[in-house]
């Protein structure tokens, strides 16, 4: 299967806002984005987390306040993008090996 056939699926929302009971989300992954572009963006998001996590692990800076929010929002964004790609995989029709 060619990666060019894989696109993001519709409906992946993230970053809850307002009262929890309302189940509202501020952002949604754009459907039909090419997998290669999404994977690059996920890689970029995860790269932003290297310094804060390393500094926290080394005891140089605690993972709190803005650093903690950076990690949380970046991970939620990356997860939503990957979940949309995984659902997009399910929508790709695979060739039948028996034909």
Model-derived features: positions:
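Sequence/structural signature of long amphipathic alpha-helices
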Residues: 1-99
């Amino acid at each position: 299967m060619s990666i060019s056939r894989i696109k993001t699926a519709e409906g992946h929302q993230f970053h809850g806002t307002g009262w929890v009971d309302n189940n509202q989300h501020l952002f949604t992954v754009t459907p039909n984005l090419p997998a290669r572009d999404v994977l690059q963006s996920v890689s970029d998001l995860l790269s932003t987390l290297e310094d804060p996590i390393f500094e926290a692990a080394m005891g140089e800076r605690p993972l709190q306040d803005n650093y903690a929010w950076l990690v949380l929002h970046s991970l939620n964004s990356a997860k939503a993008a990957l979940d949309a790609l995984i659902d997009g995989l399910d929508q790709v029709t695979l060739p039948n090996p028996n034909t």
